[in-house]
Amino acid sequence: MAKPMTITKPVATPLPWRAYLEMTKPRVVALMLLTVLVGMCLAVPGAVPVQPLIAGLVGIGMMAGAAAAYNHLIDRRIDGLMARTYNRPLPKGRISITKALTFATAMAILGFALLYWAVNPLTAWLTFASLIGYAVIYTAYLKRATPQNIVVGGLAGAMPPLLGWTAITGEFHGHALLLVIIIFAWTPPHFWALAIHRRAEYAKVDVPMLPVTHGVEFTKTCIMLYTVLLALACLYPVLVGMCGPLYLVGSTLLSCGFIYKAWQLKYRDKPGLAMQVFRFSIYHLMLLFLLLLVDHYLWS
């Protein structure tokens, strides 16, 4: 008697390029490139030159993606133990360590070369310093060494507006440093909100995030204080004449919203609120820099 025919569905296998793309943290890099673009646009009163604009965004984006890939490499052990990151390419074995290292290094070299030859050496070296700051100083050392890891290491993540500025002008300017200060003040409350939500996971892998070492309530207080500092930092562009009334009104509303969310977290906490604060902080930074961009062209 003939055997009944069975039909089996093919098992979908992830495409290799998706694993490489995931290692570059594309959503994080996209937000970072927005701040680069704003730095570029604010550096000049009129239209931004096309060559440094495109080459700068591509080169900085490549080196940022390389830094993210190095982060995946260095954190692969603890990533495999945390619910948020266990499905990343390296813990799951979708990419070998050798291939990941080759990919990250190739991206870094190509990005640096593009910035050096098509933009300017200053931007290339500053971007390289940011890569070292994030991938080596923060990820390999500070993250595991001190609960102030994100405060000290946050400087590397705050550099993109300065990189955009130097890509267009080839020089430092105080206005660009004000944008760096804004992101520097934004970084701790952004990451500490996530750390509260993932406190048990960080404790499990012995990463001394502030909620692990000093407790959740202390961290909530620090988040509130930093949102106030951030609100003050957001006023700097107005005080020095960089921005006009549109940015002033918009940034004030965003600052009040962030302070209110931090107040809720401290005094009216409920399940899931820490992640709400984390997500709000992302929209806060994105909208703030869009305000800077729109106000620049309206005000100038």
UniProtKB/Swiss-Prot annotation:
The chain crosses the membrane at residues 28-48, 50-70, 106-126, 150-170, 176-196, 222-242, 243-263, 280-300. Its main location: membrane. It is a multi-pass membrane protein. GO terms for molecular function: protoheme IX farnesyltransferase activity. Its EC number is 2.5.1.141. Belongs to the UbiA prenyltransferase family. Protoheme IX farnesyltransferase subfamily. This is Protoheme IX farnesyltransferase 1. It comes from Shewanella loihica (strain ATCC BAA-1088 / PV-4).
